[in-house]
Amino acid sequence: MDMENLTWLHGKPTASGILKANPEDFVVVEDLGFEPDGEGEHLLVRIRKNGCNTQFVADYLARFAKLHPRLVSYAGLKDRHAVTEQWFCLHLPGKEAPDLATFELEGCEVLEAVRHKRKLRIGSLKGNAFTLVLRHITDRQDVEQRLQQIAAQGVPNYFGSQRFGRGGNNLVQARLWANNEIRVKERSKRSFYLSASRSAMFNLISSHRLAQQLSTTVLEGDALQLSGRGSWFVAQADELATLQQRVTAGELNITAPLPGDSELGTHGEALAFEQACLAEQTELLSLIKRERVEGSRRAVLLKPQNMISNWWDDVTLELSFWLPAGSFATSVVREIMNQDRADDTDIIE
């Protein structure tokens, strides 16, 4: 998936700069959205890590606690080329907690450990707080104007390049799999390839909506989502004026599909628009249906919360903001500046 071909909401930036000159320039802190219970057969462990990916730390925790790897879980993957604070969950039914004071892994620090009644599962995360440092910025005035636009209107809610693997390989493999040119047995690879397929189709439809200036224009049959919620409903023709007002006010979001084996969910004009966008994606659609993946919807636009900018000097910007789970910080940066050096560091979920 070539991110350069996707439409910008605020036009292509004139400024360029560097994201993540070092890992400390990309800091991510998980927000579970709940407080641990303080009791239960699960142990939630919050770890600050630098230079370690999520699965590596989870496997190390399993060995340290003498647990099967399946008994250690987490809410979302984080890249190793960043400073991240994330939670891991150890299932310890009837067992004492391991002595985490003796836990040693280069680049990792245990911040706290709390008992909890439920397993921490993928996606059981409210969001993430980011603190980024953008360096060697060439046009401060353009960046400042874009920050104001982003605060008011948001950014496209695109899946970032990491979703598609290095060089887009996950999508390449998905197409080979769809055409029965390869067999994919590993569960993790199947998941990556299917996720890349659905994400690419979402990005494509969202980009077309932006290109036709329809990112905030309600079509008859659109699937609309209450801001901050996952559920959605279909816009009826006799409600368009009222629904348009609610979208403009930020109460509702227009969505695009993450296609599955069921119908897209839209009707009428909106359905025709989405079908036209997907007309040339028969390979990926057939794969999704063949593997019986459940479909869902995702907001076309994303508005960062609690966004604060702090210029260290005329070419260095510290930027902090909060995003809901599943959203990509690089999709925010993409609307601010062109990156002089490509870097796939990002949050995955």
Curated annotation (Swiss-Prot):
Which stretches make up the TRUD domain? 154-302
Task: List this protein's GO terms for biological process.
Answer: tRNA pseudouridine synthesis
> Which keywords has UniProt assigned to this entry?
Isomerase, tRNA processing
| Similarity comment text for this entry | Belongs to the pseudouridine synthase TruD family.
In UniProt terms, what function does this protein have? Answer: Responsible for synthesis of pseudouridine from uracil-13 in transfer RNAs.
Name recorded for this polypeptide: tRNA pseudouridine synthase D
Catalytic residues at 79
Instruction: Please name the taxonomic classification of the source.
Output: Bacteria, Pseudomonadati, Pseudomonadota, Gammaproteobacteria, Enterobacterales
In its keyword annotation, does this UniProt entry include Isomerase?
yes
> What CDD domains does the annotation carry?
PseudoU_synth_EcTruD (cd02575)
- HAMAP family according to UniProt: TruD
- What species was this sequence derived from? Yersinia pseudotuberculosis serotype O:1b (strain IP 31758)
Report the EC number(s), separated by commas if there are several: 5.4.99.27
List the molecular function annotations (GO) for this entry.
RNA binding; tRNA pseudouridine(13) synthase activity
Q: What class of enzyme is it?
A: isomerase
Specify the domain of life of the species encoding this protein.
Answer: Bacteria
Q: Which SUPFAM superfamilies match?
A: Pseudouridine synthase
Annotated substrate binding lies at 26, 128, 328
